[in-house]
Swiss-Prot record:
The keyword Cell division is assigned to this record: no
Primary location recorded for the protein, binned into one broad class: cytoplasm
One of the Pfam families matching this protein, by short name: WD40
Record note on quaternary structure: Interacts with NAR1.
Source organism of this protein record: Saccharomyces cerevisiae (strain ATCC 204508 / S288c)
Organism classification: Eukaryota, Fungi, Dikarya, Ascomycota, Saccharomycotina
Annotated protein name in UniProt: Cytosolic iron-sulfur protein assembly protein 1
Length: 330
């Protein structure tokens, strides 16, 4: 089994870290204290470079997401709004971001934000049981709601887009994952993934080109892998649970991340960071580490590319971001 080794620990907040996202060497983080902090992650340098205006939101920052291949950032808040931030061009080359727009529409806390792979759709989800899809242009200044999806029966915790297709997954307190697709400018639920016995906190798509698989993490302490069977009938897709990953977690699984390296990472309330590998069609534990944030719960995990290596980042209730390397056993 491989080992998980701490590279760097950054104390960013006094309160819990809910979310972060990585793009172009910058890690954006969101916390209960309403602040969005940006960290430069390059070589052996992990430096706080900006703190965005906390007056933009009245409550916690629950989710952050970079627009693909740009310096545009979306942040969803418990105050029911979404803020859009853009990098300011400065003569002294300092990294600063300005508030570009505030998006309103949800009736309750915004739990998740996610950009489509082309950057022209922004999905948001909320405690109001709905998923909204917003359309924007290249500037990212104006947003039009083109669809409100209301088929979940409970709080929607998370949204994620397929890495290459206009396919959206939403995870909910109603114990399901729903798959959404655009048919003739009308977004429809094309599949309901049933199997978890508790809240589904997050999901993530396989990054392999041309592959349609999804992993999900739940209150029932399991991580599941789902596969699209390629059969559409009456605008419906068949997805099946392909695997339940090895039993590592003893409490809720809050976040899962499927890396470009094919590995799946999961974190949760038990403070364990687990990494899984698929070998000849069977999923095995590749590495695991307990107490990654001491006694605190872990809310988010991401794969990052650093110096040509793939590393992991985790964020917890302790307000700390930890960076980890994976080392295979000799």
């Amino acid at each position: 089994m491989a080992s998980i080794n701490l590279i760097k620990s950054l104390k960013l907040y006094k309160e819990k870290i809910w979310s972060f996202d990585f793009s172009q060497g910058i890690l954006a983080t969101g916390s209960t204290d309403r602040k969005i902090k940006l960290v430069s992650v390059k070589y052996d340098d992990f430096t706080l470079i900006d703190v965005l205006d906390e007056t933009a939101h009245k409550k916690a920052i629950r989710s952050v997401a970079w627009r693909p291949h740009t310096s545009l950032l979306a942040a969803g808040s418990f105050d029911s709004t979404v803020s859009i931030w853009a990098k300011e061009e400065s003569a002294d080359r300092t990294f600063e971001m300005d508030l570009l727009a505030i998006i309103e529409g949800h009736e309750n806390e915004v739990k998740g934000v996610a950009w489509s792979n082309d950057g022209y759709y922004l999905a948001t989800c909320s405690r109001d049981k709905s998923v909204w899809i917003w359309e924007t242009d290249e500037s990212g200044e104006e947003y039009e709601c083109i669809s409100v999806l209301q088929e979940h029966s409970q709080d929607v915790k998370h949204v994620i887009w397929h890495p290459s297709e206009a396919l959206l997954a939403s995870s909910s307190y109603d114990d399901t994952v729903r798959i959404w697709k655009d048919y003739d400018d009308d977004w429809e639920c094309v599949a309901v993934l049933n199997g978890h016995e508790g809240t589904v906190w997050s999901s993530d798509f396989d990054k392999t080109e041309g592959v349609f698989r999804l992993c999900s993490g739940s209150d029932d302490s399991t991580v599941r892998v789902w596969k699209y069977m390629g059969d559409d009938e009456d605008d419906q897709q068949e997805w099946v649970c392909e695997a339940i990953l090895p039993d590592v977690h003893k409490r809720q699984v809050y976040n899962v991340a499927w890396g470009f390296n094919g590995l799946i990472a999961s974190v949760g309330a038990d403070g364990v960071l687990a990494v899984y590998e698929e070998v000849d069609g069977e999923w095995k534990v590749f590495a695991k580490r307990a107490l990654c944030h001491g006694v605190y719960e872990i809310n988010v995990v991401k794969w990052l590319e650093l110096n040509g290596k793939t590393i992991l980042a985790t964020g917890g209730d302790d307000g700390i971001v930890n960076f980890w390397s994976l080392e295979k056993a000799a």
